[in-house]
């Protein structure tokens, strides 16, 4: 998977994810307002603060992880384990809100889909970005490498 400590690429990926999510949200907004399906619209709008929080967290994640270099490995492992569990609980909050707080106002399926859209898009982009980044780095390193002839490349008679 992609190395999220590379700050420039992480910012680019986070902004791509946010823009794609906003494009989908605007499409749903136009569809819901033209067909009067406001429950679906509310279902899609409910996870938006959590997605924005996740994007901000993704942008600041590299700096945050660098602070843990001096701690022991066991403490860091415990922290990261709880961090990843808490991240998925953060994605669960909008679904629980839509399900328990007046279900007639929120379309629960739209809330689930829009909540899952962000982490799935992050996974897809990171797995698509990794081979592209690897290929580009190899291509650049091959272009910058100068060919130096050595004695091993000559035929010996």
UniProtKB/Swiss-Prot annotation:
The chain crosses the membrane at residues 13-33, 39-59, 81-101, 112-132. It comes from Mycoplasma pneumoniae (strain ATCC 29342 / M129 / Subtype 1) (Mycoplasmoides pneumoniae). The keyword Nucleotide-binding does not apply. It is a multi-pass membrane protein. Keywords: Cell membrane, Membrane, Transmembrane, Transmembrane helix. It is found in: Cell membrane. NCBIfam families: MG406_fam. It comes from the Bacteria. One of its GO terms (cellular component) is plasma membrane. The keyword Cell membrane applies. This is Uncharacterized protein MG406 homolog.
């Amino acid at each position: 998977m992609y190395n999220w400590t590379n700050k420039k690429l992480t910012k680019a990926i986070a902004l791509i994810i946010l823009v794609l999510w906003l494009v989908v949200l605007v499409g749903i907004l136009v569809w819901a307002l033209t067909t009067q399906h406001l429950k679906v619209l509310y279902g899609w709008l409910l996870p938006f603060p959590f997605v924005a929080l996740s994007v901000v967290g993704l942008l600041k994640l590299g700096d945050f992880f660098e602070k843990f270099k001096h701690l022991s490995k066991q403490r860091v492992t415990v922290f990261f384990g709880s961090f990843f569990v808490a991240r998925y609980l953060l994605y669960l909050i909008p679904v629980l809100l839509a399900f328990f707080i007046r279900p007639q106002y929120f379309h629960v399926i739209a809330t689930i889909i829009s909540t899952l859209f962000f982490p799935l898009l992050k996974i897809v982009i990171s797995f698509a970005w990794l081979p592209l980044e690897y290929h580009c780095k190899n291509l650049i390193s091959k272009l910058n490498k100068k060919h130096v002839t050595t004695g091993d490349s000559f035929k010996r008679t």
